[in-house]
A protein has these predicted regions:
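Bacterial Sec-dependent N-terminal signal peptides
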Residues: 1-27
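Lipid interaction determinants
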Residues: 19-89, 93-144
Length: 144
C-alpha cells in the first residue's frame, strides 16, 4: 500500500510538471533590438574648433563596416576603411541607452537609439588642452 501511495503521489506530481513549466515565460533580454548584424550607412563628426567643423562620411566601396551584437556580450566587426581591412571581436554592454564597446585596448562610450531598422550611435569627446571636443553620430541599418 505504501508503494501505491508513493507511486500515486509521483504520478500526480509528474502530471503537474509539464503544465507549470510551460507557463513560465522565457527570460527577457533588455536590449533584444540591438542584437544582430548592422551595416554602416553614414558618420557625421562635428568638431568644436575655433569654427565648428562638420565632416560627413557615407558608405561607399572604400568604406564598409558591419557590427554584430551577440547575446553573450561579444561584438564582431568587419571594417574596410579607405581600402584597409580590419576585423575582430570585442565586448559590449548596454545600460538603458548607454553603450560601451571594448576592443583590444580601446574603450568607446556612447549612447544609442534604434528607430525601426536604423541604429544611431552618438559618441562625444570633451575638449582637452591638445584636442578639440567633438561629437560623432554613426548610423547603421539592420541587415538581419
Amino acid at each position: 500500500m505504501k508503494n501505491f501511495k508513493f507511486l500515486l503521489l509521483f504520478f500526480i506530481l509528474d502530471l503537474g510538471y509539464p503544465q507549470t513549466s510551460s507557463i513560465i515565460a522565457p527570460p527577457f533580454f533588455k536590449h533584444q533590438k540591438l542584437l544582430g548584424v548592422w551595416a554602416f550607412e553614414s558618420m557625421t563628426t562635428i568638431r568644436d574648433a575655433k569654427r565648428q567643423e562638420i565632416t560627413i562620411l557615407y558608405k561607399d566601396k572604400k568604406n564598409i563596416e558591419t557590427l554584430q551584437f551577440e547575446t553573450s556580450g561579444a561584438i564582431k566587426y568587419d571594417v574596410l576603411n579607405d581600402g584597409i581591412e580590419k576585423n575582430g571581436t570585442g565586448t559590449w554592454f548596454a545600460d538603458d541607452s548607454h553603450l560601451t564597446i571594448i576592443v583590444e585596448s580601446d574603450t568607446t562610450y556612447g549612447t544609442f537609439s534604434i528607430d525601426e531598422s536604423i541604429l544611431t550611435l552618438v559618441i562625444n569627446a570633451e575638449e582637452t588642452k591638445k584636442l578639440y571636443g567633438y561629437s560623432t553620430i554613426i548610423k547603421y541599418i539592420r541587415k538581419y
